Amino acid sequence: MLHGYLSNKESFAPQIEYFSKFYRVTAPDFPGMGGANALGCPFSVSDYADWTERFLEEQGIKNPLVIAHSFGGRVAVKLLARGRVDKAVLTGCAGIVRKRTLRYKMKVRAYRIVKKLAPKYAEKHFGSAEYRTLSPVMRESYKKIVNEDLREEAKTIERPVLFVCGTEDRETPLSSAQIYHACVKDSRLLVLEKCGHFAHIENPLAFNAAAEEFFS
């Protein structure tokens, strides 16, 4: 199980409890997150995928069934494209860069101007609250991650994938899941009503049942 950005394996508590009845469940914390060691240098999505491959090899795991959320979905897309995964359930899967609005572009331009004149002010008042809490290394990693669009890699995936999206998800909206679904030829799309970005936690019964059926 591959967790979301700045999250940890505990975010999969309902899935770990449920699937441990049927499978050997492994849920690592990504480097720089949860209880893992801090990053020594900025990681890209590919770097995290490389790390995950090494982790799987160390654990003696081949062709795993994967459940991934948000950022973990980015890593899973890389692994799927490399043929390292048997099947995957990706919920709230990130990796589709949305078209930038005029407002966003103006905000970026303003940030660049203010950063030159008053860097401390820019750091305090621009960017998401999440971004402002990151260490310098994690900030550089974050930039690498969020600016990479994974559509082309998704098109190369030949393994079965179930995409799950909540109707109220604002972080990775249904439109992103639909794009992924169109890119991956052997894929399904499950939409969970009245769920947001954490559909696997908000409706674990429906999510677990769908994942179990998909994996069987």
Model-derived segments and spans:
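Conserved alpha/beta-hydrolase catalytic His-Asp/Glu region
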Residues: 100-159
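Flexible "cap/lid" loop of the alpha/beta hydrolase fold
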Residues: 74-117
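Catalytic histidine-centered segment of alpha/beta-hydrolase-like enzymes
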Residues: 195-208
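Conserved alpha/beta-hydrolase "acid-adjacent" motif
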Residues: 170-176
